[in-house]
Regions:
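A conserved ligand/cofactor-binding region detector
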Residues: 1-242
Length: 242
């Protein structure tokens, strides 16, 4: 059973191994990163103690890897949602709620001398969208995962976000980059085996036979990242690829 001592042990392990830090120099940001990595472990392969109706506790496996394996074996019809914007919200709090582990993580984090609410605010919102379109796209993924539907969401991973709005001293509105990846994103899973050449600019040239060949321009290498979307107390995991 995943208990509070197991959670604190997992967090401490990430502090020492993933972050290469020790208790004497650990601040709220470091504690958040370690706790978030611990929560990601639970979304990947571990077990969570759940209480669906606050009456009957049951023990269910919430396993990202098993979700993908089950889809591969059963070959169901899949849906792929491509959207230029996603307003995902903060992943850490959402993950703890949907795993049914928020109270245990709160207690475990307090035993380490930190406060869960202080850590939650350290997560930067994924600057991948705003407004109704972005939130609707995020709701599609949350709902699909909760209903155990094989849905994948795809978008662009904006390094500096779409933009952030600032107010100048004279009261005018300013637009500036949003460096939301300044401290990286502990919930991302880089897929170094999935890379694509993306070409900007250039021109299309006709060859013999009428074929068009793109030439010139600037070429960049795009790397894929996955982010797990936990369903509301469900074993299913949708995937968000950027």
């Amino acid at each position: 059973m995943l208990d509070v001592p197991s959670i604190t042990k997992s967090i401490v392990n990430h502090v020492q191994t993933s972050l290469s830090r020790q208790a004497y120099n650990l601040d709220d940001l470091g504690a958040y990163e370690a706790a978030a990595l611990s929560a990601k472990d639970n979304m990947l392969v571990r077990l969570a103690d759940l209480d669906r109706n606050e009456r009957t506790a049951h023990f269910a496996q919430l396993n990202w890897n098993e979700t993908q394996l089950a889809y591969t074996r059963k070959q169901p019809k899949r849906a792929y949602y491509l959207c230029i914007e996603y307003l995902m919200g903060r992943t850490f709090d959402n993950a703890l709620l949907n795993l049914g582990l928020k109270d245990k993580y709160r207690e475990g984090i307090e035993k380490l001398g930190f406060n869960l609410e202080d850590l939650l605010v350290k997560e930067r919102d994924a600057a991948l969208g705003n407004g109704g379109l972005g939130r609707l796209a995020a709701c599609y993924l949350d709902s699909s995962s909760s209903q155990e539907l094989p849905v994948w969401g795809y978008s662009l991973r904006y390094k500096y976000g779409i933009f952030q709005q600032l107010i100048a001293p004279d009261g005018s509105q300013l637009e500036a980059p949003d460096p939301w990846l300044e401290h990286l994103n502990p919930f991302e899973i880089p897929r170094y085996d999935i890379q694509y050449d993306v070409r900007f600019y250039g021109q299309a040239e006709r060859t013999t036979g009428g074929r068009a060949v793109w030439s010139g321009g600037q070429e960049v290498l795009a790397l894929a990242y996955d982010v797990m979307i936990p369903g509301n107390i469900q074993p299913n995991r949708s995937r968000f690829g950027v």
